[in-house]
Swiss-Prot record:
Substrate binds at residues 257, 272-273, 301, 913-914, 1297-1299, 1471-1475. The keyword Metal-binding does not apply. 5'-deoxyadenosylcobalamine (coenzyme B12). Belongs to the ribonucleoside diphosphate reductase class-2 family. Gene3D superfamilies: 3.20.70.20, 3.30.160.90, Hedgehog/Intein (Hint) domain (2.170.16.10), Homing endonucleases (3.10.28.10). Disulfide bonds join 273-1308. It catalyses: a 2'-deoxyribonucleoside 5'-diphosphate + [thioredoxin]-disulfide + H2O = a ribonucleoside 5'-diphosphate + [thioredoxin]-dithiol. SUPFAM superfamilies: Hedgehog/intein (Hint) domain, Homing endonucleases, PFL-like glycyl radical enzymes, R1 subunit of ribonucleotide reductase, N-terminal domain, YcfA/nrd intein domain. Provides the precursors necessary for DNA synthesis. Catalyzes the biosynthesis of deoxyribonucleotides from the corresponding ribonucleotides. This is Vitamin B12-dependent ribonucleoside-diphosphate reductase. The active site is at 913 (proton acceptor), 1297 (cysteine radical intermediate), 1299 (proton acceptor).
Length: 1740
């Protein structure tokens, strides 16, 4: 009976497969050169027959079958084959053992066997999870399962049963927040079929639910959804997980590295790369540096090892330094984290908890510690020492964040290098837990303070022994009565009280008592005894109470003190109290015989908390009563917190607190009890003690938890007093804390601390003027060094974590310096964290072509700085790329040629927006400024936000510039009538915007009956009660809404003081400038305003040092001033035209109020109807006053008085004159605006006395249109305000531009498909490519990437937001070279290029197919409608060439137009690095770098052979160790080796076997069909010239490449330049293929001018021998082959030099782990390790 089943080594039973026996025997025959198919058939038949005979239907073990194979081969006389088979078995056994060792497993499973040793080594080194001992605890199966599970989670939430893309549903998000806060409790609780979701899967799932629910798209509640999941209603998606698992474990596709590492794990970040914007201002530069650090490090900073920390382990508390904590768990095993450049201890399996702060709930919580980190920070890193008013000290890295309380009671994070003196930090605070007093620990504390142990010797005959004796002392006999009561009750012992002078004591000899307290107090010399700490807070606080009863005292300062010689105990107690909000400090007190360390508490709130936690349990009644007396008499102290009264008032009012002002005092009323808060409302500073008293009263009245949390928060506050820096090298530490990412730590106290491609073209050039300082700018190269330094700080140990891409555009004035930025990088580390590229535009190529000078432009001014020779610039660029492999080039003109996202990304923009004229005033944080001035200022600052290509009119400008404006924020009720009507005034908030100068357009003036007016374009929209309405559609009688707001203290950019502002207001009202006499005159009513006249004179004398006298003329007083006072007034008012001086619009609110008070006191009055009036001949003045009044929420109306009036005037001679006026204007303030005016501005003297506010009505901010008059054309301006789309202009609410740009901060979400897996063989053994399966896999991978966006945990909120605006994905390829090997197609052939085009066309077509289907079900990406996709355009060059289509693109485009797309971009070809190693295939779209090279493993050295090449060698009987060595010595190439057949030499080509021209054609062929770019290296041999590089650039651009990275072999070398007398000759020098030659000739025919720059004949036919500059050392005997790490030994190079070169020339991972220097090779434009897969770009 035939055998049907076989037992594998892992115990699995699998079907018997005869083909596997055939393949094993065939390989053995090939090994010895036998290619006899007939003999093969005979042997296999006999083997199978023998198996059936011996086992007769039973199940043999695989080893039994292999034994039979050996015997049958020998029976057949094939002894050499049998030997080869035995060696094969042995080698397979060795491989299995090596795999077990790598994976830390006893047995391999089927998944493990699919991966090579090399793949498993890469997985083990970077991807698989490890335990506390550094052992691998995750198998490849488990890794790919967690990745697959996460990938399918979005499918559940997009299921039509729970999701509606058009829905408008409302769900309870509080339940969602509950699940997010408690996600740890749901670890492995839910399943999708057989697959359990871990807690991180669960958290990402709930987070996605929240996101979709916030958009109204979830049809069911979170509880209903989870119930469905629990019932198995989503189990159908198990097959999706199975499929992704199959695709990955069969190495058909691989996600990028971050996804493999972080899926289903705490970090959760799945993206490979990010775009960080950088603008031409210091804030943006520093923000870019910060964001680079955040992305590369994904955490905060680190703190000094001396900082103390309290943590809990297994319910036991510990108080140690950070350094001691690290050492405590070091036995669990350290690991080096090459991703983030640090040493760490994984304690995720150990229940360690620290005190963390939850900024949302404002309370102390327990934070789970997962990892303890250690960093070495050298001299190059500036460390910051932060010291608070309470003496708390933290020495930290510059990027370490702290929690800061703003004056508005908001909690923000600030890095150490952003902190300033006066900032309010959040420190230790009460945790709100109850506390139980335990006498046993009190007694231990008392013994520690006033007890001693000694050895007592018994001399009683027959009972001689030594035992421990405990003696306790105190001056109070009552203490011993209490102690004896406890001892008798607990131990059954009571001791007689003895006395020595004035001190009482007891002797305790009972072993059970002494041993008990000896054990409790063990370790006290090092701080609070561990046995007591372990028992938690109840034990520790009781212990401290005992200490205080023994050694503490209450002082009259007032305060409490505890002094001891045990420094570490005092330090521990200090830190412990601080952790609970008791702000204790330490001081040293000298004694004759040493030092006492004194802990003292003085702060009122801390004394209160000390009493509640400790003091009330003091057993010394005298101390307790004295402490109570101190508290009752405490005046609170004068320590003030700079907090905003109005913000607190708004919060406290919700809890029933009323506030009144009594003169200068602020009064809070709680249940009719009045509590003084000092002068808070006027000084915006409040005593901490006063605030704590008030909050305690409020909590007593309300018992509200939120009030309690606010009280605890205030108690925990400390203020930064000093900040110093040091560059001394230090070892720093940090923790990874789940959820809260912070912990409580510090020296001498405790505060909460957080754990832990760039385009420089917008930066102004070096030496340019900096507007804010008139200093000189540093230039982009300088700031590139800054970002580089940030990356070096992150690197910290010499091992690079990642690299930055720096781009400078060719028109920038610093372009020459940028090109040469790495010129000094010869054996050094200059800018080693940067790959740099030059961005080139069309105009440069035109200038090069025509031989014209090329202008370099200042990005700030737009002006030409100088003109350069483009040919010289081009040659410099090519030379540096030849010499240093940097910079690369980016062809921006090619990139933008098919950019369908231009409109959506904010540029180009059509500027057809509604606008206002230049003198329209816009509310900004700097003041109430004119639109034309805002544009000029913004342009000078140079921060461009967008560019318009259409709609800019005559005299307009295409660029928009960044500004900030103010908009009304939340409203608060200022007044409520008896009828229930309310008046609400808003607080303005600052929002980002950008301003346009649009040019000349037709405008109209809108006038209202109240006097307000605005001039704007006819399509400009104003807010009305019915909504937005265009100016051109307004008519007489229409209503317009005005915003009602009051500016805050931060408003305004200039200050003159309130007194001078009042003087200026009076002068505008009743003043005159005599420019001939150089004198300014002020006028006053002699009877009623003499006091004001004296005051104004005194103010001017005080400020300007002038002499001024008052002159009385009848009922008038005149004050004339000269000198500095005159010049000051003349400079401000300019002339006697009655207008508001421009400076007033920039003043601080109090100064504007003082100005208006002066103006109204001079020219205003209060009428009989109690209306406040201001009269003037100048209507313009009153209009301007209207605008100023609106800054305080005050409405007004202007009346025209056309009737004649008389003015009486008395001359200096006493003559009375009468002046008649034909008319004047009067501004009138009525209703509730009068009340606001009285409160905010007021009048001086008798006018204020006349003002009665008894009857006030609420007035509504609504005005009535009087007329709309078309004026003609004027220059107009507009503002784009993202998200808000409005701004305040002349008091009106105006609608802004409609375009909203896509900000930068996008991310790359990548995966690569292994092309080699789709090469199949027909029945004749002929290879073919399975296009159908390929199409299927492309769509699956596109879905995987689309899903990954939804479950990604992005490092910055900007990245999260902007990634989801476009949902850009990057389906890519790898294994191209291996696929071509299998198909027998040369890489550098017309057939090869054709295959590249087709395979990429399929990639993009079917990625789009998925995206269309996803759009139908899930919706389009948010910016879809703003792109050119709806117009039928695609960002794919091949689409515009129908003659080369293989697929129906026209039909696809129609589907896109009908249904839209889910993803803005879908394909790219990134570097694949280690991911291709995991997939056991060739890297990305590159040719292989070497077919054979030597490699070391634990069992020895062996030759690594490309698997496809190896199979072919064996198939042809060519395989041998001798041949492998020969190929390895031939630079890994088979070219020119007579042992290798010609057809194999043609197919099996390496990177350096291929001419650079063919490399470019390969890149262009692939680029043609990608939506994004292709990463590929243009390899050149060492002998290549600068002319070759120039030619490569020109040809690459003409062929449509989006960028080029040239790597000349050897240009990464660290050796100095040398001229080689005899040039080393490779055996083989590549020549361009015939197809490449044809393409080159076609380009030259089309663009003949390029012959001026390249030598076409030399490219086609090779060049003559000549001496060349080389980066190879002069004494080098042979070129190194990548991967042959034995070529360079660490001992040959100084250690410090090695450290500099890691990540630049040598692999950092191989050196750190194995001490080997492995040279990096260029692959896909990135320096990559050929051994472990480490990549400089960290893309995959």
């Amino acid at each position: 009976m035939a055998v049907e089943k076989v037992m594998k080594r892992d115990g699995r039973i699998v079907p018997f497969d005869e083909s596997r026996i055939r393949w094993a025997v065939q390989r053995a025959m090939w090994e010895v050169g036998i290619r006899d198919e007939k003999k093969l058939d005979e042997v296999v038949k006999s083997i199978v027959q023998r198996i059936n005979e011996l086992y007769d239907g039973k199940i043999p073990h695989i080893e039994n079958i292999q034994d039979i194979v050996e015997l049958e081969l020998m029976r057949a006389g094939l002894f050499e084959v049998a030997k080869a088979y035995i060696l094969y078995r042995k080698k397979k056994a060795e491989i299995r053992e090596e795999k077990k060792r790598i994976l830390n497993k006893k047995e391999l499973d089927e998944i493990d066997k699919r991966f090579s040793i090399n793949a498993l080594r890469v997985l083990a080194s970077r991807y698989l999870k490890k335990d506390e001992n550094g052992n691998i605890v995750e198998s490849p199966r488990e890794l790919f399962e967690r990745v697959a599970i996460l990938a399918v989670i979005p499918d559940l939430l997009y299921d039509e049963r729970v999701f509606d893309k058009n829905g408008n549903y409302s769900q309870d998000l509080k339940r969602v927040e509950y699940y997010l806060e408690h996600f740890e409790e749901f670890d492995r609780k839910y399943s999708i079929g057989k697959y359990k979701l871990n807690k991180y899967h669960f958290e990402r799932m709930v987070n996605l639910y929240k996101e979709l629910a916030e958009q109204g798209k979830m049809k069911v509640s979170i509880d209903e959804f989870l119930a469905m999941l629990e019932k198995g209603e989503f189990n159908e998606y198990e097959k999706e997980i199975n499929e992704y698992f199959r695709l990955m474990t069969n190495q058909i596709f691989m996600p990028n590295t971050p996804a493999l590492i972080n899926s289903g794990r705490p970090l959760g970040m799945l993206s490979a790369c990010f775009v960080v914007p950088i603008e031409d201002d210091m804030e943006s530069i520093m923000k870019a540096a910060h964001d680079v650090a955040m992305i590369q490090k994904m955490g905060g900073g680190c703190i000094d090892g001396k900082a103390k920390i309290i943590f809990e382990n297994e319910g036991e508390e510990h108080l140690t330094t950070m350094e001691e904590m690290y050492e405590r768990y070091k036995h669990l095993g350290e690991f080096y984290d090459e991703e983030y450049n640090r040493w760490g201890i994984d304690v995720s399996n150990v229940p360690i908890y620290v005190k963390s702060f939850d900024p949302e709930s404002k309370r102390v919580v327990k934070g789970k510690v997962n990892v303890i980190w250690k960093y070495e920070l050298g001299k190059d890193v500036t460390k910051y020492e932060i010291i608070t008013n309470k003496g708390t000290k933290i020495l930290t890295s510059p990027w370490h964040p702290f929690f800061v309380l703003t004056p508005d009671f908001k909690i923000v994070e600030k890095r150490a290098d952003e902190l300033k003196e006066g900032d309010i930090l959040i420190g230790g605070m009460p945790d709100g837990e109850d506390y139980k007093f335990i006498f046993d620990y009190w007694l231990a504390g008392f013994i520690a303070g006033d007890g001693c142990f000694d050895k007592y010797h018994s001399h009683v005959k027959g009972h001689e022994y030594i035992y421990d004796r405990l003696r306790i002392y105190d001056y109070r006999i009552e203490t011993f009565e209490i102690i004896n009561d406890y001892l008798e009750k607990t131990f059954g012992r009571k001791y007689s009280i003895q006395k020595d002078r004035n001190i009482y004591y007891i002797d305790i000899k009972a072993r059970n008592i002494t041993s008990h307290y000896l054990k409790l107090l063990e370790g006290i010399d090092n701080g609070i005894p561990p046995q007591i700490l372990k028992e938690g807070k109840n034990a520790v606080l009781s212990f401290i109470a005992g200490l205080f009863d023994a050694e503490g005292h209450v002082s009259n300062k007032p305060g409490i003190e505890l002094g001891m010689v045990n420094k570490r105990l005092i330090e521990d107690v200090t830190h412990y109290l601080n952790a609970l909000g008791i702000k204790a400090r330490i001081r040293e007190k000298l004694r004759k015989d040493g030092i006492d360390y004194v802990l003292h508490v003085e702060e009122y709130s801390s004394l209160l908390r000390f009493y509640e936690l400790i003091g009330k349990n003091l057993q010394n009644e005298e101390k307790r009563e004295k402490l109570e007396k101190v508290l009752s008499n405490h005046k609170g102290g004068n320590f003030g917190l700079p907090l905003n009264f109005n913000a607190f008032k708004e919060w406290a009012s919700e809890y029933g607190v009323e506030f009144k002002t009594n003169g200068s005092q602020t009064i809070a009323i709680i249940n009719d009890e009045r509590i003084s808060l000092g002068q808070w409302h006027t000084r915006n500073r409040v005593s901490k003690a006063v605030l704590v008293k008030m909050l305690r009263k409020l909590y007593e009245a309300t018992k509200d938890e939120e009030v309690k949390r606010m009280l605890h928060l205030i108690e925990g506050l400390e203020v930064v007093r000093h900040i110093t820096t040091t560059n001394e090298p230090r070892t720093f530490y940090d923790l990874t804390v789940e959820n809260y990412q912070n912990y409580l730590a510090g020296e001498n106290g405790m505060i909460f601390v957080h754990n832990t491609g760039l385009n420089f073209s917008k930066l102004r050039p070096e030496g340019d003027i900096v507007g804010t300082t008139t200093g000189a700018a540093s230039g982009p190269v300088s700031f590139m060094h800054l970002i580089d330094a940030v990356s070096d700080v992150i690197k910290q140990g010499g091992v690079r974590r990642g690299a930055n891409m720096g781009i400078l555009e060719i028109w920038h004035p610093d372009i020459e310096k940028f090109i040469h930025a790495k010129e000094k990088n010869i054996g050094t580390n200059v800018l080693s964290n940067f790959n740099i590229s030059v961005g080139i535009w069309e105009d440069f190529w035109e200038a090069l072509k025509e031989g014209k000078k090329y202008p370099l432009i200042n990005p700030r001014t737009g002006e030409v700085v100088k003109e350069v020779d483009p040919k010289t610039l081009f040659e410099e660029l090519a030379y540096m790329a030849w010499a240093k492999a940097d910079p690369g080039v980016i062809f921006f003109d090619v990139i933008n040629r098919r950019n369908v996202l231009k409109k959506a990304k904010g540029g180009p923009i059509r500027a057809t927006n509604p606008c206002v004229v230049g003198d329209t005033r816009i509310l900004t944080p700097e003041g109430y400024l004119k639109a034309e001035e805002i544009f000029s200022l913004a342009k000078e600052r140079g921060k461009k936000e967008a560019v318009a290509v259409e709609g800019i009119a005559e005299e307009g400008e295409p660029y928009a510039y960044s500004v900030e404006i103010l908009l009304p924020g939340e409203e608060k009720v200022e007044y409520e009538t008896v009828h229930g009507k309310v008046l609400a005034v808003a607080d303005p908030v600052a929002v980002p915007a950008y301003v346009w100068k649009v040019g000349r357009k037709k405008v109209a003036r809108v006038k209202t009956k109240e006097g307000y007016e605005i001039t704007a374009t006819l399509d400009h929209k104003l807010m009305t009660p019915e909504g937005w309405k265009e100016v051109g559609k307004l008519k007489e009688g229409d209503k317009i809404l005005l915003p009602r707001f009051e500016v805050e203290e931060e408003f305004g950019s200039e200050s003159i003081g309130e007194d001078l502002a009042f003087v200026l207001g009076w002068f505008i009202g009743d003043g005159y400038l005599n420019v001939n006499d150089k004198r300014a005159w002020f006028y006053f009513n002699a009877e009623k305003e003499e006091e004001i006249a004296v005051r104004i004179r005194d103010i001017l004398v005080k400020h300007f040092g002038i002499k001024a006298e008052l002159h009385r003329y009848g009922n008038q007083i005149k004050l004339g001033v000269r000198g500095e006072a005159y010049r000051w007034l003349e400079n401000i008012v300019k002339n006697n035209e009655k207008r508001i001086p421009e400076i007033v619009y920039r003043l601080k609110p109090r100064e504007i109020a003082a100005f208006l008070r002066g103006l109204f006191s001079a020219d205003g009055y209060v009428d009989k109807d109690m209306a406040i009036r201001l009269t003037s001949k100048s209507r313009e003045l009153l209009r301007e006053v209207q605008d100023l009044l609106l800054l305080f929420g005050i409405l007004s109306k202007i009346y025209e008085k056309p009737y004649e009036s008389e003015f009486h005037y008395t001359t200096k001679n006493g003559e009375e004159r009468i002046y008649r006026s034909k008319g004047y204007y009067e501004l009138v303030i009525t209703n509730y605006s009068r009340k606001l005016f009285a409160e905010k501005i007021g009048l001086e003297g008798y006018k204020m006395e006349k003002l009665s506010l008894k009857k006030t009505k609420v007035d509504q901010p609504i005005v009535t249109v009087e007329s709309v008059e078309v004026l003609g054309e004027e220059i107009v301006y507009d503002f784009t305000v993202p998200n808000y789309h409005m701004y305040i202009s002349n008091g009106f609410m105006s609608h802004n531009c409609g375009e909203e740009p896509l900000y930068e901060y996008e991310s790359c979400n990548l995966a690569s498909i292994n092309l080699a897996k789709f090469v199949k063989y027909d029945e004749n053994g002929k290879p073919y490519f399975d296009w159908d399966e390929y199409a299927y896999v492309i769509q699956k991978v596109a879905k995987y990437l689309d899903n990954s966006i939804d479950v990604n945990k992005f490092p910055l909120p900007e990245i999260d937001y902007n990634t989801k605006l476009t949902r850009r994905i990057g389906v890519g390829m790898m294994g191209l070279a291996d696929a071509l090997f299998k198909l027998g197609i040369p890489y550098n052939s017309e057939e090869g290029f054709k295959f590249m085009r087709k395979v990429t066309e399929y990639l993009t077509f079917y990625a789009y197919k998925y995206s269309v289907e996803a759009a139908k079900k899930r919706g389009t990406f948010p910016l879809y409608d703003k792109t050119e996709y709806p117009e039928g355009k695609l960002p794919v060059e091949g689409f515009y060439h129908p003659e080369i289509w293989n697929l129906p693109w026209d039909k696809l485009v129609e589907e896109i137009k009908k249904y839209g797309l889910r993803n803005a971009m879908v394909t790219t070809c990134p570097p694949t690095g280690s991911v291709s190693m995991i997939a056991d295939t060739s890297s990305g779209i590159e040719p292989v770098y070497a077919l054979v090279y030597k490699k070391s493993v634990t069992v020895g050295e062996f030759y690594y052979v490309d698997p496809v090449f190896e199979e072919e060698l064996k198939k042809r009987g060519l395989y041998s160790e001798e041949l492998l060595k020969k190929i390895s010595d031939n630079y890994g190439s088979v070219q020119g080796l007579e042992e290798i057949p010609e057809d194999m030499q043609r197919v099996f080509v390496t990177a350096l076997d291929i001419h650079w021209l063919d490399h470019i054609i390969a890149q262009a062929s692939i680029q043609m069909w990608l939506t994004d770019s292709a990463s590929k290296t243009i390899n050149m041999i060492n002998e290549a010239t600068v002319e070759d590089v120039k030619a490569a650039y020109l040809i690459a651009r003409f062929l449509g490449c989006k960028g080029v990275t040239v790597y000349r072999d050897g240009s990464l070398s660290v050796q100095v330049y040398s001229v080689e007398g005899e040039k080393k000759k490779r055996r083989f020098k590549p020549k361009p293929s015939e197809y490449a030659k044809k393409i080159l000739l076609e380009i030259v025919e089309k663009e003949p001018w390029i012959k001026n720059f390249i030598n076409v004949d030399e490219i086609l036919n090779g060049k003559k021998e000549q001496l060349l500059f080389s980066l190879r050392p002069a004494n080098e005997s042979k070129l190194k082959v990548p991967g042959r790490e034995e070529e360079v030994r660490p001992g040959n190079i100084p250690e410090e030099k090695i450290r500099e070169l890691l990540g630049v020339v040598y692999c950092p991972v191989c050196y750190e782990k194995e001490g080997k220097l492995v040279e990096l090779k260029m692959e896909s434009g990135c320096a990559t390790c050929p051994v472990c897969g480490w990549s400089k770009c960290v893309i995959s």
